[in-house]
Every structure is written in structure tokens, then in C-alpha cells.
Amino acid sequence: MKKTILIVANLDTRGSEFKMVKELIESRGHHALLLDFSMEQEPFFPGDITCEEVAREGGIDDIEEVRQLYRTKRTLATENQITGAIKIVSRLLKEGKLHGVLGVGGGTSTLVSTSIMQSLPFGMPKLMASSMAGHPKYVDKYVGTKDITMLNTVVDVVELNPILEIQLINAVGAICGMVEISPGWEIVFEKPVIAVTSFGFAERAVEPAIHFLREKGFIPVPCHAQGRGDRAMDELIREGWFQGVIDIVSRGIGEELLGGNCAAGNDRLLAASESGIPQVVAPSGLDMLSIGGRPELLNNYKDRPQALIDKLRIEARTSPEELEQMAEIIADRLNCSSAPCAVLIPLKGWSSLDKEGLALYDPEADAFFTSVLKKRLNPNIPVKEVDLHLNTPEFGREAVDLFNKIYKKNQTGS
């Protein structure tokens, strides 16, 4: 079946490169749609969607004004073309005229292309062939929490040469393969899909929970709560991919509050609360703060009990005062939930690092957290305390049983 692949291009500085890419896609039997966001000068040839069209959609009627901005306030020119391109691509998506996106280029092209890609839904094939793909600090911004595939061109995307041609061929092969085999991004599942937050310090609870969910007729999807993973989960919740959450590892709240390595944004828990899906929340990860590789944090927490996992992963114990703030945040965000929710608290420790005899064990601090949470939560939100350690299969079963109860309540409205 013939598919439409959008090529994001700057045809004023790259001509032969995009001509080759377009011809390669068409040789595979697909429609190649060139979107030109040129800002600097006249393009070598016009795109299927011209830079003038992109400029107008961004809010500037005259492309010469964009070119003037590019010379004096380049950021504003770039932002205009990104805005215009996103509007055009959004329409193509709604009209069913878009099946994949390919970007090719250096710094500016990568920024524009990935900004467009970040506006698209999960599952839409997105490939960025970039000379910036080997730059870790930039890639973090280009990809964010989206399912964008980066291909390192190794050499710069400036005029065709044997090495660049190999990478362009590979890029076309990759995006064509994606659109040919992709099941699409509007999949209807026969069973409810449930997000389960996870990390290594709670895996003995998470893995059994996944098994128990399957037994009860759900489709579990583990989400790695390392900051990016829980942000991605929240975005997928807002896109409608999940019908419930078992949030065993809520660590992103504390990491965000205290500036740790695994900060998950200032709206953790709110996606589920505002989307009207049931959620069970447990406190795994709130007992620690990830400070590895951060001299300022290592210094600030030097007097705290610490667990050294490896040279990058150092976990410091959180204090009662910090846990009090976390409890208040969690309570406030659950209080605004439009669907049933519950909290599940283990009494014998919250992670594999938080148990008797280990550095992060502090049952008094954990108990203080629970007392603050209970006082601040709405009385209709249950807090179930269980005489278990969190990192056990038994806790995983408790989490699933509690979730199943509130899920049914949400379904029946009673």
C-alpha cells in the first residue's frame, strides 16, 4: 500500500541531498512530500509545501520578512517556521494524508524536524538523520519523551558524497520500512491497557504485578520511572493510551521537588487525575534521591545515609521534612482526581535499598510521610497499609487487587 512520507527540508541550503531522498522514497513506491522551511534565501527548487506557505501559517505573510528576521533575530524566524510547519502537519494528520516523517540535516534542520515530530502522536514513524545525533546534550532536547528515532549521519549533511549517500540510503530504508510495517497510531485494544511504573529497586513487586494484571484480563505496560519514562507515561495517558495506572514507583515527585537526577516534571500524577482514569499510588523511590554525577548534590547530601550502586547511581536517604512536602504534593494531586484512586503503603520498607540493616532504612520517616498524607487526603480516598515490604511479590499482588477494585468501581460508577 502506498504511503505518504513527509520530508522536512531546508531547500535553500540543501538541494541535491533532498532530491536524492525524495527519489529514493518514490522508488520504493511511496509518495514523498517535501515540506520546505527555508529561511535564508531562495530555495534550489520549490517544495511540495513551500517555505512561503509555512511562513504564512506561522503568522508572517511575506517570506522576505522571515529572511530578514533570520539575519537579525534568527530564533524568531525559526520559531515562526516551526509553528507554521506544525499547523500544516497537524492538518495532514487529521486528513489521513500522513504516515511517517523524515528529517535530514544539521543543527537547524534537526531542531525544526524534531519539533514537528514531537507534535505528532505516539506510533507515527519519525526518523531524524542528523549530524547532531552523536551529541548527547542536544539529543535529549531533540527526542524528549517522544518515540523519535535518531540516525547519526557521522559526516555533515553538506553536498552528496559516498559516505553521506550511504547514510541517506539507510535513512530512507528505515523510514520506508517503518511506514510499511507500522500498525498505525490509532489502535483499538480488546482489553484495558494499564501503565505500571517500575525501576530496579522495586522489580520484585513490579514483575509479579504485571503477571497478576494479565491474569485479571488487563494489558500491562511497564514504564521505567527514571524521569523521562514517567513523563512519557503521563503524555501517553493524556493521549488516551492507558485506562489505568498502578504507580508503584512515584519517585519522580521527590526527584522534581529536590532537583534529583530523575525529576519527572511538576505535574506527576495529574495526567491520570485529570484524564479520569483510576490509579493506585505507592511510595517506592520517595525514600531516596538520585544524586550521582552531581557535585552540588553530592555535597548537599554528604551527611545523609547513602547507597552506592555504581559510579553514576548514588542514592541519598530523604528526610522527614522532605517526605512531608512529598506527601502534601501527592495528596493535593490525588484530591483533584475525577476517577477513583487509592494509596498503598508497605510498612516494612519502600524499596530494595530501604529495609532493615541497609543504609536507607528509616521506618520513622516513612511513618511520618503516611501520617501527613492521611491528614491531607480527601476522606473518600483510601490509604491501605500492609504489613509487607514493597519489593515483594505479595505487595505486587496487593497493588493489583486494590487496582482491580477501584477499576471496577470506576466502570460501574458505584
Regions found by a protein language model. Give the residues of each.
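N-terminal phosphate-binding or glycine-rich loops at protein starts, especially the Walker A/P-loop
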Residues: M1-P43, G100, S109-S119, G123-M128
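C-terminal non-catalytic interaction/assembly regions of soluble proteins
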Residues: T4, T13-S27, H31-L33, G260-S414
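Gly/Ser/Thr-rich loops at beta-strand to alpha-helix junctions
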Residues: N10-S16, H99, G103-S113, A133, ...
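Glycine-rich phosphate/diphosphate-binding loop of Rossmann-like nucleotide-binding domains
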Residues: R14-L24, L33, M39-I49, F189-R231, ...
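Phosphate/nucleotide-donor binding subsite
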Residues: P46-K97
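Cap/lid and interdomain-hinge subdomains that line or gate substrate/regulatory clefts
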Residues: R67-K73, P136-F201, Q325, D332, ...
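Short, acidic/small-residue loops that bind anionic groups at enzyme active sites
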Residues: G100, V112-Y142, T149-N152, V221-A225, ...
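Short Gly/Thr/Asp-enriched flexible loops that form oxyanion-binding sites at enzyme active sites
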Residues: G103-F122, V206-A209, K355-D362
